């Protein structure tokens, strides 16, 4: 528990910056929607003629001239990218920073085995992702309160639940990368999160690449799909949870056998 508290304290500044940036941007866009509503109606007509581009961004399912459509396409995209990048960055640094910073020897002096250190490190990743989501969603709700509008509660919860699963999957895979590396691979993990997003776009636009939807967690957590259908593809969400568990198990095996640099 002491190690968990230490990690939360060390990452407090980072999580505040990310949560306020992502949540504040989303809330600000919600507050701006009323003033942009008329121009959004004109943009809806323009986007409807853009074929594959509209399909990639979900504008063939939702109208951005409505609050639900605007949130499900524009704001959901900002939240998804911001959340995945935060999860990737958090997972990427959690284990490897000890080797890079030559603090493994200090950890070895604590009355904790590798198994407990690993457990509390991963618990810190999960808790940081949960705190990020809590803070950003609170800011988003403040935005809705200020705008005097609110989306369907069930769909809103489904979307953010799917996003949480997506972020935990990305964070867990990057946690595995952290276990494999002696240095923080933050750049590579941020790039990995972006590649997953690009894969989601490509599988929606290029029929031959449709199989990528089974690879990228952005597909089942896509805001436009969830707000248009009112449901989550739970089969894919369950597969994401399996990938998450396998990543953590693999990371544990690697970490237990690893020759840690002091």
Q: What function would you assign to each model-found segment?
A:
Residues 114-115:
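Alpha-helix N-cap/start motif
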Residues 71-96:
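Long, hydrophobic alpha-helical segments
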Residues 23, 30-31, 68-76, 119-175, ...:
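Secretory targeting signals
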Residues 87-91, 139, 172-173, 217, ...:
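Hydrophobic/aromatic residues in alpha-helical transmembrane segments
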Residues 88-108, 122:
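Transmembrane helix boundary and interhelical loop/hinge segments in multi-pass membrane proteins
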Residues 11-14, 28-68, 188-262:
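Terminal transmembrane helical anchor/hairpin motif
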Residues 1-22:
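Aromatic- and glycine-rich beta-strand/loop motifs that create alpha-glucan
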């Amino acid at each position: 528990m002491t190690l968990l508290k230490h990690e939360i304290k060390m990452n407090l500044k980072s999580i505040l910056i990310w949560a306020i940036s992502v949540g504040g941007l989303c809330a600000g866009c919600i507050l701006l929607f009323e003033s942009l509503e008329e121009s959004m109606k004109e943009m809806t007509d323009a986007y409807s003629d853009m074929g594959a581009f509209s399909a990639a961004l979900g504008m063939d399912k939702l109208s951005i001239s409505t609050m639900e459509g605007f949130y499900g396409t524009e704001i959901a995209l900002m939240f998804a990218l911001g959340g995945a990048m935060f999860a990737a960055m958090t997972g990427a640094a959690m284990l490897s920073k000890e080797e890079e910073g030559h603090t493994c020897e200090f950890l070895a002096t604590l009355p904790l085995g590798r198994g407990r250190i690993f457990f509390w490190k991963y618990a810190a990743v999960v808790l940081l992702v949960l705190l990020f989501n809590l803070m950003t969603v609170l800011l988003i709700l403040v935005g809705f309160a200020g705008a005097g509008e609110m989306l369907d509660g069930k769909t809103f919860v489904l979307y953010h639940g799917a996003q949480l699963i997506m972020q935990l999957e990305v964070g867990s895979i990057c946690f595995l990368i952290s276990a494999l590396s002696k240095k923080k691979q933050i750049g590579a993990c941020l790039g990995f999160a972006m590649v997953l997003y690009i894969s989601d776009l490509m599988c929606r636009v290029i029929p031959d690449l449709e199989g990528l939807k089974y690879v990228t967690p952005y597909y089942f957590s896509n805001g436009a799909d969830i707000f248009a259908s009112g449901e989550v593809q739970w089969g894919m969400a369950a597969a994401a949870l399996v990938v998450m568990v396998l990543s953590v198990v693999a990371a544990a095996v690697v970490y237990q056998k690893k020759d840690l640099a002091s």
